[in-house]
Amino acid sequence: MAYDKFTTLTSSAVPLPIENVDTDQIIPARFLKATERKGFGDNLFRDWRYNSDNTPKERFILNNPIYSGKILVGGKNFGSGSSREHAAWAIYDYGFRCVVSSFFADIFRNNCLNIGVLPVQVSTEFLEQIFNAIYDNPTTEIEINLKTQTITLLSSGTQESFAINGYKKNNMLNGFDDIDYLQNIKSDIETFSESRPF
C-alpha cells in the first residue's frame, strides 16, 4: 500500500486562518530539489516558521506548543499558485492527514488525495465555527469520517457533509495510490482483455 488507510480521524487541529496560502508559502521553491517524499516536513511553511538565522519565529502557529494535531485548518483558497506536488508532500511529512478549508485549488486538492492527505471543503460559516472552537480550547477535537463524508466539531456536535470524488474516496479507504488500484484490479483487466475479439 502507498499509505495508511483513511477511515475516521479524530484529532485536535492547528488553525491557520490565512486566505490565499499558495504552494510557495507551503514549501519554498529552494527546497524542491529532492525527488523523494521524505524530509519536506522540516521545511513546511519555512519562511513563516523561521527567521533568516534559522531561529523559530515564536508567533507562528506551528511553533506554538499549545496547538497540535493531525488536522490543519486553513483559510479560503488554500493551496493556490503553482502545481508543485511537494506542497502536499510537506504537509503529509509534517504529520497532517487532513486539511480543512472553505476552498481548495484543484491541483493542490488532487495532489493531496494522491498521497493520502484528505482535503475537506466546508462552508465559510462552519470554518469560522471551527476556528472559534479551537481558539476557545486548543485541545478541542474534530472528527473526520470518510465513509460517511462528514466532519464533526465534537465540542458542539455541529456537523457538515463534504464532497469527494468516488474513485479517490475508494483509494483513500483502502490506502491505494493509482498503481495500487490498478494492481488490485489486474485480474479484472486481464479477464476483460481476454474477452475482447480483437
For the regions a language model picked out, list residue spans one by one.
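Cytosolic catalytic domains that perform sulfur/thiol-centered chemistry
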Residues: 1-198
